[in-house]
Amino acid sequence: MTVSIYLVKGRDKALRRRHPWIFSRGIEKMDGKPQLGETVEIYSNSGEWLARGAFSPQSQIRARVWTFDKNEAIDKDFFVRKLNQAQGLRDILAEREGLTGYRLIAAESDGLPGITIDRYQNYFVCQLLSAGAEANKDQLVEALIECYPDCNIYERSDVSVRKKEGLKQRTGVLHGEEPPESVIIEENGVKISVDIVNGHKTGFYLDQRDSRERSCKYVKDKSVLNCFSYTGGFGLYALKGGAKHVINADVSQLALDNAKNNTEINGFDLSKAEFLNADVFKLLREYRDNGTKFDVVIMDPPKFAESKNQLVGACRGYKDINMLAMQILNPGGTLLTYSCSGLMDTGLFQKIVADAALDAKRTVQFIERFEQAADHPLDSAYPEGFYLKGFACRVI
């Protein structure tokens, strides 16, 4: 028997604008007891059918919408249609930018709530972040196999957000072969080695591709400090752009070893690159205190705010780290700074950087704005899909 959800009167406005989330406080009643991730019918308070979605009894987001079409079933064919639709955009990007690695499915922004799929050559790496995604895993895998008959599918659902959905963390092969230690992808003429099994997220930060390419114009004949370098993405583009010297700083020796390997496979001059195992906050203070200066500092830290109650602390962290970066820049130098915290909007991030400039006693000009790459699209009904923002700043 299909379970039906009825919304509180007046709580259907966002849904009518095709926002895909229904919060627990918006539900008036339910006919039946849905299981974890079960597909349910969603009605207005007066009984008008509105959508079909996945139920999550433990999450504040109690249901995520699969479809607003009453005649559309949630089956393998549904996922095939969504995959083909998403591939259309990625084909354009792959041809234009020479990509062999990209985000194929960006969750709600591609009409598949809680599902992220990154493609590295013929390896499809899935993160299933919601109860509905988990419940429909088999159909999703079948759809991937139909669309990409020679694919290898690997799961990287080792993320803490699954706990909020009542799910355990999972990793492993879903179809085909185990990924090798290194899968080489290419973007904008740069080769990048990706560790699918042990790397951050699904192996690489694909969302910064456009920012990496645009950073090249700031680095020619410059000294560059690449903070939170991971496997060297920005550092590789700095060498591509003609940097005089690049220091890649990260706390993970494994990531730094991969960064060095990436430098070698691109044929860049290793004498121009340095790989420093260090805590970035401590390193910046050391550079400030001993008078070390750079022409360009790239600041791409991990997410500082996972929830609203962490936002105040995150603001302090972003301000401190940007202040330190400004203090070690030569006059007229460039700060490329980013935030991937979705809870921090662009205006707030800009204010934080401005406040950091005051504390650093430096004048800052915002000269360029950055955001996530086009394979991480923003659906018009889902503004929460925008999370990555950044600035190029001239520091005087």
UniProtKB/Swiss-Prot annotation:
* Catalytic activity line of the entry: cytidine(1962) in 23S rRNA + S-adenosyl-L-methionine = 5-methylcytidine(1962) in 23S rRNA + S-adenosyl-L-homocysteine + H(+)
Which cell locations does it reside in? Cytoplasm
Q: Which UniProt keywords apply?
A: Cytoplasm, Methyltransferase, RNA-binding, rRNA processing, S-adenosyl-L-methionine, Transferase
Q: Where this protein primarily resides, as one coarse class?
A: cytoplasm
| Known role | Specifically methylates the cytosine at position 1962 (m5C1962) of 23S rRNA.
List each copy of the PUA domain by range. 2-81
What's the encoding gene here? Answer: rlmI
Family classification: Belongs to the methyltransferase superfamily. RlmI family.
Organism of derivation: Aliivibrio salmonicida (strain LFI1238)
Record EC number: 2.1.1.191
What molecular functions are annotated in GO for this chain?
Answer: RNA binding; rRNA (cytosine) methyltransferase activity
A Pfam family the protein falls into: Methyltrans_SAM
Q: Which InterPro entries match?
A: PUA (IPR002478), PUA-like_sf (IPR015947), PUA_sf (IPR036974), RLMI (IPR023542), RlmI-like_PUA (IPR041532), SAM-dep_methyl-trfase (IPR019614), SAM-dependent_MTases_sf (IPR029063)
Gene Ontology cellular component? Answer: cytoplasm
Q: Has UniProt tagged this entry with the keyword rRNA processing?
A: yes
What does the organism's lineage look like at the top?
A: Bacteria, Pseudomonadati, Pseudomonadota, Gammaproteobacteria, Vibrionales
Q: What is this protein called?
A: Ribosomal RNA large subunit methyltransferase I
